[in-house]
Amino acid sequence: MSPENQSSVSEFLLLGLPIRPEQQAVFFTLFLGMYLTTVLGNLLIMLLIQLDSHLHTPMYFFLSHLALTDISFSSVTVPKMLMDMRTKYKSILYEECISQMYFFIFFTDLDSFLITSMAYDRYVAICHPLHYTVIMREELCVFLVAVSWILSCASSLSHTLLLTRLSFCAANTIPHVFCDLAALLKLSCSDIFLNELVMFTVGVVVITLPFMCILVSYGYIGATILRVPSTKGIHKALSTCGSHLSVVSLYYGSIFGQYLFPTVSSSIDKDVIVALMYTVVTPMLNPFIYSLRNRDMKEALGKLFSRATFFSW
């Protein structure tokens, strides 16, 4: 059924950030800088992995896909948010809102699956180092990434199709910076029980289960590290997992409660701040985490700068 038959609302109004008008310019500059840092930083990660043959390993294969996902993730919401900060009428068409919500959920879930695949890679590398190349072969890596994309698509498509069946009668103001699924459900004048049931069920599949897999992986990793007799071996294992653990903490720390328990009452400002954490801050920090705490990435970055300096002369 077409949106025109289901809804009398042709557009939504995004309230945006809860800031005063005189603060708009400062926050616009801040978020523009953060967005550009996200795009350029993750593009640099992808470039380094592509150019340096030493980085053609399963770990960096997953990282390159994570970098692409982070760029796409931020690009779904931040450009529209920046544009709204420069205009007085912060509207978004019904179709654009549904599309934004679809891709937001898609890349959120894809992040979760990719981070889980990286945890499995670290588990094999530390717990089964002698069989690493046999287990983490190219076919398995491609399969894990392909499944991540397919499951993410299925998840976002299920939410989107269910949402298009709802009616939006009069209220069209979204107290958010983008078209958030939970905010849209609150505006609907239809029965949203099925939507909330699917939201909770899918949330368990794409958030809780991957998180449990990560915990189990690091449980085995921790047990293996404790059996390592040398401090050098422990340091190497920790340095291998440190970057990934930081990303896991940032990602799940900011979205776990809000995504899994969407009906829990919370202030609007808190929802916006949490959303900004995982749409702006986390994608921006990921390149720094992997470049500053990873020896291979720092060496590849040094080679790139040396090559650029050589050609500049």
UniProtKB/Swiss-Prot annotation:
Question: Where are glycans found on this sequence?
Answer: 5
Extracellular topological domain ranges are: 1-25, 80-100, 159-196, 260-272
- Gene Ontology terms: cellular component: plasma membrane
Q: Which Pfam families does this chain map to?
A: 7tm_4 (PF13853)
Q: Does the keyword S-adenosyl-L-methionine apply?
A: no
The record lists its disulfide bonds as 97-189
Q: Which UniProt keywords apply?
A: Cell membrane, Disulfide bond, G-protein coupled receptor, Glycoprotein, Membrane, Olfaction, Receptor, Sensory transduction, Transducer, Transmembrane, Transmembrane helix
Q: Which InterPro entries match?
A: GPCR_Rhodpsn, GPCR_Rhodpsn_7TM, Olfact_rcpt
Give TM regions: 26-49, 58-79, 101-120, 140-158, 197-219, 237-259, 273-292
GO BP terms: namely: signal transduction
Subcellular location(s) of the protein: Cell membrane
The residue spans the entry assigns to the Cytoplasmic side of the membrane are as follows 50-57, 121-139, 220-236, 293-313
Q: A single Gene Ontology molecular function, please?
A: olfactory receptor activity
List the SUPFAM superfamilies.
Family A G protein-coupled receptor-like
Q: How does it sit in the membrane?
A: Multi-pass membrane protein
**Function according to Swiss-Prot or TrEMBL:** Odorant receptor.
Family according to the record: Belongs to the G-protein coupled receptor 1 family.
- Can you say what this protein is called? Olfactory receptor 1J2
Native species of this protein? Homo sapiens
Q: Which gene encodes it?
A: OR1J2
